[in-house]
């Protein structure tokens, strides 16, 4: 894209700047549209499981319901509690929303179709995702209310706990791919499973890590059955209790952008990303972005299905799963994978 702007007679600095802005908009704007659509899909899936119709009034089949809800919150008054820390109260949802967008910079949508094709892409995602907890902590502290405060404490402990397990799980992927680059990780999966399947998930050593990563993704995004931060019977609406209008909407958008990101990471890191499921020449005629979107939609359906059907964990069960089950297993698996690669690849 920089070359295109340079061909119009611009200097390299101006061309690079405009190309960067255009790339950001090409990701951010479709992402916002995608978030609106998956909120609609989420509600439709819950309704179908509960034998209801779901959104069906605004637009054909209720497709415009999310946009109507967005317009509603945009027109509402932003109410700030009298005892709240005004500056921190307003900046917390902005942090959550911004961090949710930043991680998409290194996601490959097709071969070479990535905003920032950096060598440490996976490390960048881990670093950026760890910043999301700051928005949650600030919202709980700045609200000056007990329910958001307790929710923020839960959320910070939960996110930090599962980020440790996620880090060790992803080391296994890096060992097999021999790279932190997201494009290279996808390419390393070509024909990996049984010689014909384009996925790390069909590797017997990596399949348990894929399952643990999927469950950890639910915990990292505070989705059911790990939605302890927003347990209605205990904490009202959690750290979002005192928020209204666009501040509340930014939290909502950030949450669903993170859910979409985790679905994408499941597809990219373990199930071939933009590669077709089978390493068969005719399947490569389908654009890679179509395969990636199909996998993302599958994982989003799993997320919604679990949320609608699985009962909520107790807080002690949540912590036990992260620290006493996932962390030891992921550590042991790193040693197993390292030994296997030493004997097969590097011997």
From Swiss-Prot:
* Annotated Pfam families: NADHdh
Q: What class of enzyme is it?
A: translocase
An annotated GO cellular component of this protein is: plasma membrane
Instruction: Give yes or no: UniProt keyword Cell membrane.
Output: yes
* Residues annotated as signal peptide: none
EC number(s) recorded for this UniProt protein = 7.1.1.-
Query: What is the membrane topology noted in the UniProt record heading this document?
Result: Multi-pass membrane protein
Record function comment:
NDH-1 shuttles electrons from NADH, via FMN and iron-sulfur (Fe-S) centers, to quinones in the respiratory chain. The immediate electron acceptor for the enzyme in this species is believed to be ubiquinone. Couples the redox reaction to proton translocation (for every two electrons transferred, four hydrogen ions are translocated across the cytoplasmic membrane), and thus conserves the redox energy in a proton gradient. This subunit may bind ubiquinone.
Q: What is this protein called?
A: NADH-quinone oxidoreductase subunit H
Look up and give the organism this protein is from. Answer: Sphingopyxis alaskensis (strain DSM 13593 / LMG 18877 / RB2256) (Sphingomonas alaskensis)
Organismal lineage: Bacteria, Pseudomonadati, Pseudomonadota, Alphaproteobacteria, Sphingomonadales
Protein encoded by which gene: nuoH
